[in-house]
Amino acid sequence: MTGLNTAGADRDLATAELNRELQDKGFLLTTTEDIINWARNGSLHWMTFGLACCAVEMMQTSMPRYDLERFGTAPRASPRQSDLMIVAGTLTNKMAPALRKVYDQMPEPRYVISMGSCANGGGYYHYSYSVVRGCDRIVPVDIYVPGCPPTAEALLYGILQLQRRASGAPARW
């Protein structure tokens, strides 16, 4: 499939394949781990760690135009209820321990998306004495979303790639 509206194509293919298998055999043979991963893939609970202007673009993904929740994600205020942290903005040396503390409070499996040039590598403030040159020096990052600031579409694409990666399919980045 080509075009802009291919977000649910993989899910539709998987559903069609599952229906064919159920019609042929009448039962489905799988593991508990596969079922749990399938359920987790469709229900990412994310929390924001917005530090600068990228956080404004992050908020736009939850607005009606993009409606991030239609992909099975939901915002959470507590790290103990989240399995995805989106780091957006300039990370300073003073803020780095707080970022690590929040990350450590998240339950397993936990994912991190680094959003924007500042979170990816320090951005415009890269050579400043007080800026961490990328949040991947503090926490392991799964997906990098480039841009200054990245658009809401770029973040949405990054979240969809994380869902593909969590399901075991290769990410298309």
Curated annotation (Swiss-Prot):
Source domain of life: Bacteria
EC number: 7.1.1.-
Binding, [4Fe-4S] cluster: C53, C54, C118, C148
Main localisation: membrane
Cofactor: [4Fe-4S] cluster
KW Cell membrane (keyword) present: yes
GO molecular function, one term: iron ion binding
Cofactor notes: Binds 1 [4Fe-4S] cluster.
Keyword Translocase among UniProt keywords: yes
InterPro entries documented for this protein: NADH_UbQ_OxRdtase-like_20kDa, NADH_UQ_OxRdtase_20Kd_su
A single GO cellular-component term on record: respiratory chain complex I
Cellular localization per UniProt: Cell inner membrane
Topology in membrane: Peripheral membrane protein
Signal peptide positions on this chain: none
Catalysed reactions, semicolon-separated: a quinone + NADH + 5 H(+)(in) = a quinol + NAD(+) + 4 H(+)(out)
Gene Ontology biological process terms from the UniProt entry: aerobic respiration; electron transport coupled proton transport
Family according to the record: Belongs to the complex I 20 kDa subunit family.
Function: NDH-1 shuttles electrons from NADH, via FMN and iron-sulfur (Fe-S) centers, to quinones in the respiratory chain. The immediate electron acceptor for the enzyme in this species is believed to be ubiquinone. Couples the redox reaction to proton translocation (for every two electrons transferred, four hydrogen ions are translocated across the cytoplasmic membrane), and thus conserves the redox energy in a proton gradient.
NCBIfam families assigned: nuoB_fam, PRK06411.1
Name by which UniProt lists this protein: NADH-quinone oxidoreductase subunit 6
Naturally occurring in which organism (per UniProt): Paracoccus denitrificans
Primary gene name: nqo6
